[in-house]
Regions:
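A short, charged, amphipathic alpha-helix used as a generic interaction element across diverse proteins
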Residues: 111-119
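STAS-typified acidic loop motif
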Residues: 2-37, 53
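Acidic phosphotransfer microenvironment of two-component signaling modules
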Residues: 30, 109-110
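Short acidic-hydrophobic, aromatic-tinged amphipathic segments that line or gate anion-handling sites
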Residues: 101-109
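Amphipathic alpha-helical interaction surfaces in cytosolic regulatory modules
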Residues: 26-102
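Actinobacteria-biased recognition of intrinsically disordered, low-complexity terminal regions
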Residues: 1-4, 42, 118-120
Length: 120
């Protein structure tokens, strides 16, 4: 993984959580996308991408999240984000409409609760 970003994963039942730390841009977005997709299985009903420790997200990163959400929707899976507020990432999420394309939560427990309460 690029020195710009680090991705750590953990599992909560059948829900993978990917914590992205650092900067996401065109130089590392393919690698990050491949890692995110590798976390999904046919058993997964959802995935959470935690951007709380992400310091930069360019248009390539935004596009990755939109694309991943669409891919998951076609498989009857849901993508949710965790975004610290206030943060530069929260502003980018609002400006680009990511918050209308997928659920965005302030904390991981909030995101997990939402996905478990509404598995559809």
């Amino acid at each position: 993984m690029s020195t710009l970003a680090r991705l750590e994963d953990e599992w909560h039942d059948e829900i993978p959580v990917a914590r992205v730390q650092g900067e996401v841009d065109a130089s590392n977005v393919k690698e990050i996308g491949d890692r995110l997709r590798s976390l999904l299985s046919n058993r997964s009903v959802a995935m959470i991408v935690d951007l709380s420790a992400t310091t930069y997200l360019d248009s390539a990163g935004i596009n990755l999240l939109f694309t991943l959400a669409e891919e998951m929707r076609s498989r009857q899976q849901r993508l949710a984000l965790v975004v610290a507020d206030p943060s530069p990432i929260a502003r980018m999420v609002a400006l680009t409409g990511l918050d209308r394309a997928m659920p965005v939560h302030r904390t991981l427990p909030e995101a997990l609760g939402d996905l478990r309460d509404d598995p559809a």
